[in-house]
Structure formats: structure tokens, C-alpha cells
Curated annotation (Swiss-Prot):
Modified residues (N5-methylglutamine): Q151
Gene: rplC
Region (Disordered): 136-155
Keyword terms of this UniProt record: Methylation, Ribonucleoprotein, Ribosomal protein, RNA-binding, rRNA-binding
Designated name of the protein: Large ribosomal subunit protein uL3
SUPFAM superfamilies per the UniProt record, alphabetical: Translation proteins (SSF50447)
GO molecular function, one term: structural constituent of ribosome
Subunit structure: Part of the 50S ribosomal subunit. Forms a cluster with proteins L14 and L19.
Post-translational modification: Methylated by PrmB.
Alphabetical list of Gene3D superfamilies matching this protein: 3.30.160.810, Translation factors (2.40.30.10)
Segments forming a coiled coil: none
A GO cellular component entry from the record: ribosome
Protein family membership: Belongs to the universal ribosomal protein uL3 family.
Length: 215
């Protein structure tokens, strides 16, 4: 099991393949991605690499973390993330990870934070159909309707789909195919859409569930 990398979502575009079909692509940029530290089975109970990305001013780093970066002999990083690895896949501290860590045609899993939508109603949040547009319905056209039963059980069960905060959730999209890798521009072109807003950070790692399809 290899380490993943931290990348930045740039935006979306599209290309046409040999069959004339349009393929949607999401562009992610890999820049200043370095190994900050190791987590070992003997000391921590598991094997992992600590990956950091994007340089940060030393004045904005806490004293304990300054020592961590000083020991690694690298500049402070804005984002840090651990990636579990197998024992044979350790990489030297301060080593850089580039876009060629992945190859075109490979399948990857993307973990990112979805765009926040604020307080949303049941139709937007859970795709409810709403109530009738006419025939006696007044004011409550977009209402979710009844939320419970009667005196027994006399309560609304936990987990009931209702209006509430939507978005800002950590989600993982599995088995996205890498269309191309541009080493010169430090870009990875991934087929399909990826959660998150432009310039947001996400993690890219090898797909856990291997699939074999022709796209």
C-alpha cells in the first residue's frame, strides 16, 4: 500500500476522445508536496507517512510544530495529512512527491470536503418531491410533511431526514480514472467531478477497490 498525496483542485474542463465523445475532466495541481515525518509500527502502532503541502510563514507556526519541521529540515507546511502505508513503502523525510507518483489510466480514490450550502430545505438536501402545488395545499408546498407518528412513540426518531445544514462533509469518491498527467504544469487530469470548491485541498491515493473497465 503506497502513500497518497495532497493536491489542490484547480477547476474543470473537457476534451474529446477518438470517438467524438466529450469527457469531463477535473484538474488538480501537485506542488510543494513533501514528506514531513514517519509513523512506525514499533513506536506508534501503525506505519504511515506524514505529508505536507504549501509553504507557510514561520511566524504562523506553533513552537512544537516548528521543531517538527526543523527536524525534517524543510520549510513549514500549511496542510498536513497522514497516509497509511505498508512497511516496504517508506519514503525518506524531506523527499518531494510529484505528479509522476501516478500514471495515466490508473484508478484513484479522492477524499475532499464538499461545498457548504448552509441551511437547506428537505427538497434540496434530500431530494424530496415536496407537497402538491395546488388542490388545497397552502404555504407548505416545499415542506417535508409529517415527521412522526402519534402519541406512541410520541417523538421524532434520530436520523429523520429533515431540513438542516448541508455540505461541508468529508467524502471519498472511489475509482476515478486518471486521464493524463502533465509533469511540466504539475497537473493531474481526472475523469469526472470531484467534491470541493476551486483551490480547495484534497487527497489522492491508489484505488482500494480495483476495477477493470474501458472508458
Amino acid at each position: 500500500m503506497r502513500t497518497g498525496i495532497i493536491a489542490q483542485k484547480i477547476g474543470m474542463t473537457s476534451v474529446f476522445n477518438d470517438k467524438g465523445e466529450r469527457i469531463s475532466l477535473t484538474l488538480v495541481k501537485v506542488d510543494d508536496c513533501q514528506v514531513v515525518g514517519h509513523k512506525t509500527l514499533e513506536k506508534h502502532g501503525y506505519n504511515a507517512l506524514v505529508i505536507g503541502v504549501k509553504d507557510k510563514k514561520i511566524s504562523r507556526v506553533t513552537k512544537p510544530m516548528r521543531q517538527v519541521f526543523a527536524n525534517a529540515k524543510i520549510s513549514p507546511k500549511t496542510k498536513l495529512k497522514e497516509f497509511r502505508i505498508s512497511e516496504e513503502n517508506f519514503i525518506d523525510i524531506a523527499a518531494s512527491l510529484e505528479v509522476d507518483h501516478f500514471t495515466a489510466g490508473q484508478f484513484v480514490d479522492i477524499t475532499a470536503t464538499t461545498i457548504g450550502k448552509g441551511f437547506a430545505g428537505s427538497m434540496k438536501r434530500h431530494n424530496f418531491r415536496g407537497l402538491e402545488a395546488s388542490h388545497g395545499v397552502s404555504i407548505s408546498h416545499r415542506s417535508h410533511g409529517s415527521t412522526g407518528q402519534r402519541q406512541d412513540p410520541g417523538k421524532v426518531f434520530k436520523g429523520k431526514k429533515m431540513a438542516g445544514h448541508m455540505g461541508c462533509n468529508k467524502v471519498t469518491i472511489q475509482n476515478l480514472k486518471i486521464f493524463a498527467v502533465d509533469k511540466e504544469r504539475k497537473l493531474i487530469m481526472i475523469q469526472g467531478s470531484i467534491p470541493g470548491h476551486k483551490n480547495s485541498y484534497l487527497s489522492v491515493k491508489d484505488a482500494i477497490k480495483k476495477i477493470s473497465i474501458t472508458v
